[in-house]
UniProtKB/Swiss-Prot annotation:
Keywords: Metal-binding, mRNA processing, mRNA splicing, Nucleus, Repeat, RNA-binding, Spliceosome, Zinc, Zinc-finger. It comes from Xenopus laevis. Gene3D superfamilies: 3.30.70.330, Zinc finger, RanBP2-type. Residues 429-458 have a biased composition (Low complexity). Belongs to the RBM5/RBM10 family. The keyword Metal-binding applies. Component of the spliceosome A complex (also known as the prespliceosome). Appears to dissociate from the spliceosome upon formation of the spliceosome B complex (also known as the precatalytic spliceosome), in which the heterotrimeric U4/U6.U5 snRNPs are bound. Residues 1-87, 396-458, 523-559 are annotated as: Disordered. One of its GO terms (cellular component) is nucleus. This is RNA-binding protein 5-A. SUPFAM superfamilies: Ran binding protein zinc finger-like (SSF90209), RNA-binding domain, RBD (SSF54928). A zinc finger (C2H2-type) spans 667-692.
Length: 833
């Protein structure tokens, strides 16, 4: 019963009562809670690191546990739905039931280890040799502590694990080995309408707005389990006509690969694609071998995987496997996922690559199809290839005419993605096989854009002038680094932001957008003359021209950029010359006449219109039809002070005949297009108007040739211009500044010094002492034993007490600084003696 005794009020509130015990219990609870939280976070991080870098399918129990954790324990926003993490048990053994796999994971590796060390150690053991060794690294290049060792077959990995008893000693440290099993991902969902992969939390497609439920209902049978093996293909589930070679040396060439594979298969240079870095031009470590069929590829793969010792090229062990894509965008009926982006971009890259390779004759066997109809694996990608057939054919046609840009500029293909996939059999046919019409495919697959007319359904690079199109959206254009221009994926045109013109690579024609007609219209004929025409355009060429026509040269994106730049420069130069002909005179040649300024403003405002730009030819026609010539005596008059000087007038009159520009019958100035009431007004306008002089100068400049105009411009620039004199004339000479005042020394005020000459008998103190019996000259005190002179005010040294030696140097308050220094010097000198 003692434990049931209630605590009294005094004990609860006492200084050393149970409050101290309660605080101790709270501290223990906090420490326990913090320890559990840290243990939980450590287990989460450990689990995430392990799950993120497993490469192959996990057991069913792990899949169900991961699915429940993602779908139940996490909310839509990505965070855990249950806030009490301590209710969960994280102390699970992840390695209780490992599924055997041909990939082995090495954990607990030293930080300073590299792939070569692991590869040499693994290859030093007797038995099966690994196909590939991958060490996971951080961004800094250091090891993350784990690596993957992949074998060719499952029995090789299991026998190697049993031989080493799941342990390995590297640099004196025991390393644990486990089978690598992946964790499938179920977060994202695929839109069946547009083929876009959306996040799990989206209820509608980000591109087309289709509901998520529609895609779930339209999913093919067996697609629910397809994601489990979508990212990784099993040993017997995926075959391809292409083989990937890993661990290629940085300086290995195609000839070395051909010589290494020569004992097993007969290949040519066009069957091998060696991937290189664009910046360093060195190999990126892998290459692709394209074979005629998937059957031959599987046979070659089986031969290379069973080699003992394994295949080596330039001293490096080569890993061999089917070329496969790790990107998932399209779900096929058999459960595989194929990237829509990779299919289209790889098709374009393959077309560009094949067009640059030397043409092989049909008898040599070098022109192979990726996958032919009826072969194994082609049915898996038939639907995907048909969807992208129009776009692929258009890009291939552009490559054949030599006007398509480089593959990496229009549709870049990541080097890390395996670049060999099944293409449509229509593009790569064996000699003699029938081909389908590309135009029918384009017409069948092209669909008009939403909100536009049916005429807008033209395929890319098939712009027809006159048809209506949607307003171009420059925000969707893709920048082409190789050419420096922007590519429109909808129309296939190249856009130059400087000249705002479009370039059609198929027709080699320059276009511009007409907002009123909602269409692309061709530019002027003379504007596109600088563009390069297709080879073989003239039917009457010689035999050499026919031979060149048979071998068209590939026109790269750099050549297209040079053509557009040259054409834009010619247009800008024409515009600049036309604007220079209408440039007004310089500021010093402008006068202060208000009427002339107003007239010139109107003239400058109207000169931009097309009708006003044609006034010079109209004026010349009127001058040529003039029959009678006015008398020259009417022009003799004196210029006013506001007009130009005599040299300028002589230059104007000598260069241009002013009389041809006057209509004396209608009393009008043909140059300024003004009519006057009488002859005197017309004469004054001719002689005094600044507007007439400026227009005359513009007309004179328009008649000059380009060389004469440049010479005149150079002469004007070289002529010295006294701008200071112009400012003095216009604004006047400023007044000189006021002289600076002299600084006067401050006046010295003499203060009163009543005791400077001594104290006389008239002061009050002297009178008081005399009243008490004191006489002048006697000392103070009863017996006159005191001082006889008055006390002098003296300056003491700082810090010295009264009466201390050296406390006073005999300096008085009335002494000057010079006297005080001299007395202090003498006092210190006497102290030293």
């Amino acid at each position: 019963m003692g434990s049931d005794k209630r605590v009294s009020r005094s004990e609860r509130s006492g200084r050393y009562g149970s409050g101290f015990d309660r605080d101790d219990r709270d501290d223990r609870d906090n420490r326990s809670r913090r320890r559990d939280s840290e243990y939980k976070r450590y287990r989460d991080e450990r689990s995430d690191r392990y799950d993120d870098y497993r490469d192959y399918d996990s057991p069913e129990r792990d899949r169900m546990r991961d699915r429940e954790r993602r779908n139940s324990d996490r909310s839509e926003d990505g965070y855990h739905s249950d806030g009490d993490y301590m209710d969960h048990d994280y102390r699970q053994d992840y390695y209780m039931d490992e599924k055997e796999s041909k990939t082995i994971m090495l954990r607990g590796l030293p930080i300073n280890i590299n792939e070569n060390d692991i590869r040499e150690l693994v290859e030093s053991f007797e038995g099966p040799q690994p196909a590939d060794v991958r060490l996971m690294k951080r961004k800094t290049g250091l090891s993350r502590g784990f690596a993957f060792v992949e074998f060719y077959h499952l029995q090789d990995s299991t026998s190697w694990m049993e031989a080493n008893q799941k342990k390995l000693v590297i640099q004196g440290k025991t390393i644990a080995m486990h089978y690598s099993n992946p964790r499938p991902k179920f977060e994202d969902w695929l839109c069946n309408k547009c083929g876009l992969y959306n996040f799990r939390r989206r209820l509608k497609c980000f591109r087309c707005g289709a509901a998520k439920a529609e895609s779930d209902m339209e999913a093919p049978s067996g697609s629910s389990e397809a994601p489990q093996s979508a990212d990784y293909y099993s040993d017997s589930g995926y075959v391809s006509s292409a083989i990937i070679l890993r661990n290629i040396g940085p300086h290995t060439v195609v000839d070395s690969i051909l010589s290494a594979l020569a004992p097993y298969v007969s290949l040519v240079v066009s069957n091998i694609r060696l991937i290189k870095d664009k910046q360093t031009q060195q190999n990126r470590g892998f290459a692709f071998v394209q074979l005629p069929s998937a059957l031959e590829a599987s046979q070659l793969l089986q031969i290379l995987q069973t080699l003992h010792p394994p295949l080596k090229i330039d001293g490096k062990t080569i890993g061999v496997d089917f070329a496969k894509s790790a990107r998932k965008d399209l779900v096929l009926p058999d459960g595989h996922r194929v990237s829509a982006f990779s299919v289209a971009s790889t098709a374009i890259a393959a077309a560009q690559w094949s067009s640059t390779q030397p043409a092989q004759q049909s008898g040599e066997g070098g022109d192979y199809a990726y996958l032919q109809p009826g072969q194994e694996g082609c049915s898996n990608y038939g639907q995907c290839s048909q969807d992208y057939q129009p776009f692929y054919q258009t890009q291939t046609g552009a490559a054949e005419q030599g006007t398509a840009p480089q593959a990496e500029s229009s549709s870049p293909v990541p080097a890390t993605t395996s670049a060999v996939v099944c293409q449509s059999p229509q593009m790569y046919q064996q000699p003699g096989s029938p081909t389908q019409s590309s135009t029918s495919t384009v017409a069948a697959s092209a669909t008009p854009a939403s909100g536009t007319s049916a005429e807008e359904a033209a395929a890319p690079n098939a712009i027809v002038p006159g048809l209506k199109y949607s307003v171009p959206d420059t925000s969707t254009y893709q920048y082409d680094e190789s050419s420096g221009y922007y590519y429109d994926p909808q129309t296939g045109l190249y856009y130059d932001p400087n000249s705002q013109y479009y370039y059609n690579s198929l027709t080699q024609q320059y276009l511009y957008w007409d907002g009123e007609k909602q269409t692309y219209l061709p530019a002027a004929d003379g504007a596109g003359q600088s563009g390069t025409q297709p080879n073989g355009a003239n039917p009457g060429t010689s035999k050499e021209g026919k031979e060149k026509k048979e071998k068209p040269k590939s026109k790269t994106a750099q050549q297209i950029a040079k053509d557009m730049e040259r054409w834009a420069k010619s247009l800008n130069k024409q515009k600049e010359n036309f604007k220079n002909s209408f440039q007004p005179l310089r500021d010093e040649e402008r006068k202060e006449s208000a009427a002339a300024d107003a007239g010139f403003a109107l003239f400058e405002k109207k000169q931009g219109s097309l009708l006003e730009r044609q006034f010079l030819p109209d004026m010349m026609m009127m001058v040529n039809t003039e029959e009678e010539k006015p008398p020259n005596t009417a022009l003799v008059a004196a210029y006013s002070g506001d007009s130009d000087n005599e040299e300028e007038n002589e230059r104007f009159i000598g260069a241009v005949d002013d009389e041809k520009l006057m209509d004396w019958k209608k009393l009008a100035c043909l140059l300024c297009r003004r009519q006057f009431p009488n002859k005197d007004a017309l004469t004054r306008h001719q002689q005094l108007s600044d507007l007439h002089k400026q227009n005359l100068e513009v007309y004179r400049r328009s008649k000059l040739s380009e060389q004469e105009y440049e010479a005149e411009q150079t002469e004007r620039e070289s002529k010295y211009r006294d701008r200071a004199a112009e400012r003095r004339v216009k604004y006047g000479i400023p007044e000189p500044p006021e002289p600076k005042r002299k600084r006067f020394a401050p006046t010295v005020v003499n203060y009163e010094q009543p005791t400077k000459d001594g104290i006389d008998n008239s002061n009050i103190g002297n009178k008081m002492l005399q009243a008490m019996g004191w006489k002048e000259g006697s000392g103070l005190g009863r017996k006159s034993q005191g001082i006889t002179a008055p006390i002098q005010a003296q300056v003491r040294m700082r810090g010295a007490g009264l009466g201390a030696k050296g406390s006073s140097y005999g300096v008085n308050t009335s002494d000057s600084y010079k006297d005080a220094v001299r007395k202090a010097m003498f006092a210190r000198f006497s102290e030293m003696e």
